[in-house]
Amino acid sequence: MMILVTGGARSGKSRHAEALIGDAPQVLYIATSQILDDEMAARIQHHKDGRPAHWRTAECWRHLDTLITADLAPDDAILLECITTMVTNLLFALGGENDPEQWDYAAMERAIDDEIQILIAACQRCPAKVVLVTNEVGMGIVPENRLARHFRDIAGRVNQRLAAAADEVWLVVSGIGVKIK
């Protein structure tokens, strides 16, 4: 079962996603963040400290089909957090050292879509419950710079693809989860 949990920043998405995992005997938490500064390190540690001790953590943001496999048991669970961070990492990996003003966003989106299609296929083959957390980025103002606009657009389309493929979709607002699919 593939479940998508979306919402704004600090909306309670993580807590809601963790509740959806329930009491699965084996949980793999896939963290897509990269530790780039002390603040991010502290945020990641805060999340780790709040998880049950038996949860395993894998830090990975690419080739997720190597972790989400058909070998898992049906009562196991995977929590992947977060899709928008994965999209950010992919954008910057694809852009390399080039100026973001010169990036070919259409080609980058195709490459990101390929990665998302592989992720969806892995989730659909996996017998375990897979909960994906993402940020709802399309409810705010139009960003003023090109990179931010393209990120918002790409992340929004990624979320649409994931929602279409998911068995359930939850929107979390102010700590309250609303099932929308």
From Swiss-Prot:
As recorded in UniProt, coiled-coil segments are none
Which Enzyme Commission number(s) are listed? 2.7.1.156, 2.7.7.62
One GO biological-process annotation of the entry reads: cobalamin biosynthetic process
Keyword GTP-binding assigned to the entry: answer is yes
Q: Which Pfam families match?
A: CobU
For this UniProt entry, the molecular function terms from Gene Ontology, in alphabetical order, are:
adenosylcobinamide kinase activity; ATP binding; cobinamide phosphate guanylyltransferase activity; GTP binding
* Catalytic machinery residues: 47
Q: Which CDD domains match?
A: CobU
Q: Which reaction does it catalyse?
A: adenosylcob(III)inamide + GTP = adenosylcob(III)inamide phosphate + GDP + H(+); adenosylcob(III)inamide + ATP = adenosylcob(III)inamide phosphate + ADP + H(+); adenosylcob(III)inamide phosphate + GTP + H(+) = adenosylcob(III)inamide-GDP + diphosphate
Give, as in the UniProt entry, the pathway in which the protein acts: Cofactor biosynthesis; adenosylcobalamin biosynthesis; adenosylcobalamin from cob(II)yrinate a,c-diamide: step 5/7; Cofactor biosynthesis; adenosylcobalamin biosynthesis; adenosylcobalamin from cob(II)yrinate a,c-diamide: step 6/7
Q: Temperature-related activity notes?
A: Optimum temperature is 37 degrees Celsius.
Report the outcome of residue 47 to A: Almost no residual activity
The record's section on InterPro entries has: CobU/CobP (IPR003203), P-loop_NTPase (IPR027417)
- Return the SUPFAM superfamilies for the record: P-loop containing nucleoside triphosphate hydrolases
The protein's pH behavior is summarized as: Optimum pH is 8.8-9.0.
Query: Mind telling me which residue stretches traverse the membrane in this protein?
Result: none
Q: What class of enzyme is it?
A: transferase
What family does the entry list? Belongs to the CobU/CobP family.
So what does this one do? Catalyzes ATP-dependent phosphorylation of adenosylcobinamide and addition of GMP to adenosylcobinamide phosphate.
The name of this protein is: Bifunctional adenosylcobalamin biosynthesis protein CobU
